[in-house]
Design a protein with these regions (language model features):
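Feature for long, exposed domains in two main contexts
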Residues: 2-161
């Protein structure tokens, strides 16, 4: 009976050590984080009343690295399938589209005091003919900032037929 208890305790200790090792190696390390913060002076946009017949609407938010170190955008996701986002880089490239589900990796590094544009695109027809009324949507941006790792941009639209 004592041998069984010893094996049980040794097994539990080994399991705990393995779990600790895996948790430490799967999470981001302190070297991956920076003190810089990604900001947007405008975090909300009102499209006002839009017609389904007019199709998609878009708005550009300006994202700025407000720190002294390069910051990396790691992920962009939207709150609904009716919303997509594109990153418009300073060299004229477009990264995206980023949506609600599987999106391409971002991995865009923004230098200190540099800005990029995030284009929010809303499809008023995505919910079909019954999708009228006020729609609130969000775009979530993940970064490697230790101070503020997430930025949320929001918009609202009153959809009519």
């Amino acid at each position: 009976m004592k041998n069984n208890n010893i094996f049980l305790w040794v097994g539990l200790i080994i399991l705990a050590l393995v779990l600790i090792f895996v948790a430490k190696n799967n999470g981001p390390t302190g070297d991956n984080f920076v003190k810089s913060v990604l900001i947007s002076e405008e975090t909300f946009w009102d499209f006002k009343t839009i017609s389904m017949a007019d199709g998609n609407v878009s708005h550009d938010f300006v994202l700025k690295n407000n720190g002294s170190e390069p910051i990396k955008i790691t992920k962009i996701q939207t709150s609904c399938m009716c919303t997509n986002a594109n990153l418009l880089t300073n060299d004229g490239k477009v990264k995206g589209p980023f949506g609600m589900h599987e999106s391409p990796p971002v991995n865009l590094e923004i230098m200190p005091n540099e800005s990029v544009k995030l284009q929010a695109i809303f499809d008023p027809n995505a919910h079909g003919p019954a999708g009228v009324g006020v729609m609130d949507r969000s775009i979530y941006i993940d970064t490697n900032s230790s101070e503020k790792p997430k930025l949320e941009l929001k918009f609202v639209a009153n959809v009519i037929k």
